[in-house]
Amino acid sequence: GLGDVYKRQIPFCAKRCLYCDFFSNTDMKFKEPYIDAAIREMELRQEYIGGEPLDTIYFGGGTPSQLQQVDFERIFEAADRLFGTSSCTEITLEANPDDMTPEYVASLRNLPFNRISMGVQSFKEKDLRFLNRRHDREQALRAVGLCKENGIQNISIDLIYGLPGQTLEEWQENLDDAIRLEIPHISAYHLIYEEGTALYKLMEAGKVTPIEEDLSVTLFSTLINRLTEAGYLHYEISNFGRPGYFSRHNSSYWTGTKYIGIGPSAHSYNGESRQWNISSLPRYLQGIKAGIPDIEIEELDINTKYNDFIITGLRTMWGIRTADIRERFGEEKQTYLEQQAATYLRQGLLIRENDTLTLSKKGIFISDGIMSDLLWV
């Protein structure tokens, strides 16, 4: 594995996005109590990942760029004291383009961040307005420029496609903007209508209409073709990176590395159990204050571990080694996998090279269906 991984959920946003179903809070008065609680949670859960030093740190959202240098300094000091951060290879800050002012980006030079992941979502004004984002096209372009001027080359952006009314041409222009900016890593996600979001309510009321499935497929294949032609490697279903710029942090999720998540609704995994924190900020603060973090725990049996291994492995260009299946889960599971995979191999939806199964270019389009057939039920 990659050593251990640490993820911080910073649950604050200045404004809630239309499609968002992540936990976040727009009230900054909780910021200080939250940082105190997060440091206390690290102390309480120090043993969870078994004391190995951290390999990557990821500040996720909400919007961590709502925190200031002094806030980050407190958190880094605690993480180093409790887990050891000197061997960290990648430290990522998730940021909104409109938070990336010249002063803010300059202040990051005093902190150990070496990667920025920016929630651009689109370079089109109408998309940004529809998604209820705070930034505009100009701010997104400027934010990327500021990072580069301040020596941060390792930049990732998120893009969303499949918006109501989106055309193929608009999506191509978005991708061309990203390529032209020489952004070395791009994560692209299809818009999802999650129950409970403002977007879902608009769909229910008939005010927005999801795009046709044929167009979704065309947008996805355009994404793959455009970025591959431009020199990006399609290393995970939603992720594209230039060589040397894959996200080590995300790769650790897909390779079964232990990780600890700190903060409301953060998830953790140590090979034997999955844990996730309560999403309510007041309840989270209360639990930490009492010295009893409010955590749900799922102990993982061998079948769940096998299913996790299949889902995470097949999402990547590295795929699944059948020898690993035999070694980790026994011969019965290996035989089952080979039987279940046979049809897809014949149809050219899975590829087998040496000992490794990967999705073919065609297979990527129906990956969910293929994966569910390979699972142990």
Name each region found by the language model:
Residues P11-F22:
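Local cysteine-cluster metal-coordination motifs and their immediate loop/turn environment
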Residues E331-T343:
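Short amphipathic alpha-helical interaction segments
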Residues R346-D355:
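A short, conserved structural fragment
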Residues I364-V377:
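Short, amphipathic alpha-helical interaction segments positioned at domain boundaries
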